[in-house]
């Protein structure tokens, strides 16, 4: 009997002490601590830019010219036409694009959740819209019809198994994103010299053209 009382006492102490435990790791930030300032959105948006900067990779902007008939032997771009491309091969474009799209949608959702009219924050929504258009542009060029996802997905989201969206609908979404981005992005002349490497209104307008 005494043992039962003793064990019950120990369990009660352990349970009461658990109530004060921190479930969030002390070295991690929660959404409640982030997405509050212009700099928070800027730092997150910085993570979208590597998709434009790879030279010898699938995210290289120059590839769309290199895949023309003047450059068919460069980087093995003619591997399909000469029969060297195997059905089992994948260069990761599909996975990479949708991974970036999830990052983009997280940014868009947090901007919208603020209900802000601050142009300094809304410019990063413009950048995210530009990058969403760019990712779908890459998917469209490679695959044609692709699933058009417009929000972040979880592991149990039904959209993970959605059918491909017709090419025309994806094209319209790209053009709309670029138009909306052009309304939020600053002109290059409005930017400080130190930040002129970021996406501008002119870039969105030129891409849309």
Model-derived regions: residue spans:
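Membrane-proximal, proline-rich intrinsically disordered regions
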Residues: 18-62
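Active-site neighborhood of glycoside hydrolase catalytic domains
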Residues: 208
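Short linear capping/connector segments at secondary-structure termini
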Residues: 27-30, 83-85, 151-158
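Conserved, well-structured interaction surfaces
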Residues: 38, 42, 50-54, 75-143, ...
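Short, well-structured active-site flanking segments
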Residues: 140-152
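Aromatic-lined, polymer-binding surfaces characteristic
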Residues: 149, 194-205
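Short, solvent-exposed turn/loop segments enriched in Gly/Ser/Thr/Pro and often Arg
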Residues: 59-76, 147, 196-198
């Amino acid at each position: 009997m005494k043992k039962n009382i003793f064990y019950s006492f120990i369990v009660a102490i352990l349970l009461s002490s658990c109530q004060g435990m921190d479930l969030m790791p002390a070295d991690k930030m929660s959404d409640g601590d982030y997405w509050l300032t212009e700099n928070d959105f800027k730092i997150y948006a910085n993570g979208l830019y590597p998709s434009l900067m790879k030279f010898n990779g699938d995210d290289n902007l120059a590839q769309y010219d290199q895949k023309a008939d003047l450059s068919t032997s460069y980087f093995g771009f003619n591997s399909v036409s000469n029969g060297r491309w195997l059905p089992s091969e994948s260069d990761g474009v599909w996975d990479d694009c949708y991974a970036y799209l999830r990052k983009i949608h997280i940014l868009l959702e947090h901007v919208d959740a603020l209900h802000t009219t601050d142009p300094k924050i809304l410019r990063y929504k413009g950048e995210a819209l530009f990058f969403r258009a760019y990712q779908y542009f890459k998917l469209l060029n490679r695959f044609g019809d692709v699933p058009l996802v417009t929000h972040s997905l979880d592991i149990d989201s039904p959209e993970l198994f959605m059918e491909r969206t017709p090419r025309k609908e994806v094209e319209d979404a790209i053009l709309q994103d670029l138009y909306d981005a052009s309304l939020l992005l600053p002109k290059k002349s409005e930017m400080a010299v130190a930040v002129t490497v970021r996406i501008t209104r002119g870039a969105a307008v030129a891409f849309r053209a």
